[in-house]
């Protein structure tokens, strides 16, 4: 027999972890975006100092309209995941049905970031690091999704 209290605690822990990691990711992306924009402004002014050509190209490619759109989309998805996970924490506390949406969004952004990494990253080591980080996120979302599914199935059985 499954201990639903353990499932509930496990889901709560996973959801809190998702909130923390997505919040950190959000802050990191915002600071990175600001830094890259400031670097681009300096490059456009001609203040390249002794930066290698590869670094200048990396800054310029990170500030294309497409990459700015992708960054904004990722920030919005991170915000949505955090908001829905906070709502799920309330649902867990009140023994209500848990929403799968933050976990679906997490899966989608994980797959999207792996694909984006292959399309935009030239260094094999950077691609490998991206895959490892996204695999960790993917496993966390999958774990939380499974626990949410177990709790929701139990809640459906109880109400029927």
What annotation goes with each model-predicted range?
Residues 1-39, 61-65, 159-160:
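Cytosolic juxtamembrane helix and N-cap/initiation of the first transmembrane helix
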Residues 3-17, 55-69, 91, 95-98, ...:
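Membrane-interfacial loop-to-transmembrane-helix junctions in polytopic alpha-helical membrane proteins
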Residues 105-147:
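Alpha-helical membrane-associated segments of multi-pass integral membrane proteins
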């Amino acid at each position: 027999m499954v201990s639903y209290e353990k499932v509930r605690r496990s889901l709560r822990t996973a959801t809190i972890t998702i909130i923390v990691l997505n919040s950190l990711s959000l802050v990191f992306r915002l600071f990175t975006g600001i830094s890259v924009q400031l670097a681009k402004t300096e490059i456009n002014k001609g203040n390249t100092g002794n930066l290698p050509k590869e670094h200048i190209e990396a800054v310029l490619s990170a500030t294309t309209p497409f990459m700015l759109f992708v960054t904004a989309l990722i920030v919005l998805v991170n915000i949505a995941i955090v908001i829905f996970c906070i709502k799920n924490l309330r649902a867990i506390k009140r023994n209500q049905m848990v929403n799968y949406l933050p976990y679906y969004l997490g899966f989608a952004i994980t797959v999207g970031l792996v694909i984006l990494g292959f399309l935009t990253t030239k260094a094999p080591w950077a691609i490998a690091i991206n895959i490892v980080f996204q695999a960790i996120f993917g496993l966390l979302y999958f774990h939380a999704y499974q626990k949410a599914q177990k709790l929701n199935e139990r809640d459906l059985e109880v109400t029927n």
